[in-house]
Structures are given as structure tokens and as C-alpha cells.
Amino acid sequence: MTYKRIDTSEYPQQLAQKADRVREMFRPFHLNEVEVFESPASHYRMRAEFRVWHEGDDLYYIMFNPETREKIRMNEFIPGSLLINELMKELISLLKPNDVLRRKLFQVDFLTTTTGEAIISLLYHRPLDDQWEQEAIQLREALTSIAKVEVIGRARKQKRVLYKESVTEEVKVDGKSYLSLQTENSFTQPNAIINQQMISWAKRHAGNNSHDLLELYCGNGNFTLPLAENFNRVLATEISKSSVAAARENAELNNIKNVTVVRMSAEEFSAALSGELESKRAADAEIHSFDCQTVLVDPPRAGLDKDTLKLVSQYQRIIYISCNPETLTENIHDLSSSHKVTAAAMFDQFPYTDHIETGVVLERKS
């Protein structure tokens, strides 16, 4: 929950500097071009977290200066969606006079969609009782004039969901819309516009195929479902139980029938595919029946481990989405004996920060 004050007029210059860094990063791989995808300069983040500061009768959101750790009062949040900013103001005005809802409240999390839905999570340093729930129900009703809002209370070893713990986002890719169930406290792409551009880029480079797609780290099916129409079948793996459930539900929601989602880590899948591990989940999914020639990976910051690198090196085409340039370049070097980079892109998922999201396509050398 750190925050540096931003000046939107500086965004074009910052984007250009970031793009230069990415071009330099890919220079050793002899690429002629790196596509750069620009974010909106403001109101691009669909989720945000704030600490709550109590000062007498006053109550307000804060974030911290990353260098000095100084508290910054947040009456608005320029990176946050317009809906986050609207809800911030209304919520704090409703919490201030409410002794039950404000007592030992220390954090508020917002998750919003482009379709006007939101989840507000209230985090406490105390157990939540029935009185809290009654007040929270009234709070939710008061906020419905702004958006379709769900309210969730969290405390140590406790979670109180009033009605639902998910919202439905509409992801628009190349003129087509996909519904995406997004669950509270599960990973979702923070920048909706950039996310749509990432999916579109991946679809373009995937091409239209008669074979199958393997996807590792599929999350809630963010890439899986739009790419399903590019392939005969899709075999997708994910370790998070809630994300697997969301991916399967999203496939049903969009009436996509050619996707199989398996709850396995990339390491487990690799071992099961090679025959080193007996797995009922792998057997039930009939993983050996798939004819995968393309693999899509969107790993955590640590990148791909040795076993997963060995696995992906067997495929004709690798589409690699990365949130860490260092581990990405290491992995590309590891794959350089079998594959070459044929396309690269920078997606400015996190404007005004040093964080860089990139995508590369690697093709097997002839």
C-alpha cells in the first residue's frame, strides 16, 4: 500500500523510457520490433487497497510513501477506476458516524469491474458478530445507488459474506465479449484495458490451429477462454482451488465446451505427463489424449523452473507472458538452444512504476 504522487502529464515520457528499457532488454535476441501497448494515464486500476486511519472522530484512507514511509491521506486515487473513486467518498462518509462498522477497522479493499459492479472488503482487528452484519447489510443497501456492490467482512480466521463473494466482468477482445467471474481475494488482472490488449496480442500470435493448446498458470481462465476458439481443444492447469473453480464456471458461463481445467501445479503436470508421477486428476483429464503444439505460460515473478522449462521446450510455439523481465530473459536464454524469439511486446500494466509486463513468442528452430 505504497503510493507516489503522480502527474499524468509525465506519462508519455515515462512510457517512452520504459519502452526503451524493454527494447534494450530484448536486443540480445535480435528482434527488430517490440510492440508497446499504452495504458490510460488515469483511472486504469480496477482494484485498490487502503489502510484506514482513525484520528478522533475523523476516519480516512491512507497509503505510505515508499521511501519515507510517511502517511499519505487518500481522498482520491487517480490510478483507481472512476467507480473506486466514487465508492471511496461515499463509503467513508457512511463509515464515519457508524460506531459498529468503524470500530477496529484497519483496511478497505476495492475490486471493481468495467460493468459497474464492485466488492468492498472491510478488514478488522476484532471478531465480527451479528450486529456487524446487520449494519453491513444497511451499508450495502446505501451503496446500491452508486453500483451493484457486495460487502465482505474479514477478521482473523473469519470471513462474513453478506450475499456473494464474486462479481462478473465483461472482457472485450477483438469485438467479442467474454464474461469473467472474479472472486474476492483471488488474482485478477488489475488494468482492464491492458488486459484486453494482452489477450488480443496472444490470440493474434496463436493463430488458428487444428491442434491443441496447453496453458500453465491459467488462473480464472483469463487467456484460456478467448484463446479456445483458436484451437481444437485447450488443456489448462492451475494450482489455486478458487481459481480453478472460477475458470470452470467461466467456461460454462461463456458456453465454451473445448476447455479442460486441471488443478495441478506446473511441476506436477510435467511429472504426470512424463510418467514420473501417477495422478488421478491427470488421468481423469486424459492429459495424454491432447495434441498440444502450442503452450501459453503466465508464471509468477519467479519465472519457469528447470522442470517446467524442460516441458515447454518440447512445444513448437511458446507464448510467454511475464511480470518479471529478469526471470523472463533468463528463461529465454535457457530456451535459446531450441527456440528463437519471433515477437515481443510491452504492456504498461502498471504506469508510473518500474514494473514491466511483457509478452514474447518463441518458435522452435528448424
Swiss-Prot record:
Domain of life: Bacteria
E.C. numbers: 2.1.1.-, 2.1.1.35
GO terms classed as biological process: tRNA methylation
CDD domains attached to this UniProt entry: AdoMet_MTases (cd02440)
Keywords, ordered alphabetically: Methyltransferase, S-adenosyl-L-methionine, Transferase, tRNA processing
Entry's family note: Belongs to the class I-like SAM-binding methyltransferase superfamily. RNA M5U methyltransferase family. TrmA subfamily.
Protein purpose: Dual-specificity methyltransferase that catalyzes the formation of 5-methyluridine at position 54 (m5U54) in all tRNAs, and that of position 341 (m5U341) in tmRNA (transfer-mRNA).
Annotated protein name in UniProt: tRNA/tmRNA (uracil-C(5))-methyltransferase
Annotated organism of origin: Idiomarina loihiensis (strain ATCC BAA-735 / DSM 15497 / L2-TR)
Lineage per the UniProt record: Bacteria, Pseudomonadati, Pseudomonadota, Gammaproteobacteria, Alteromonadales
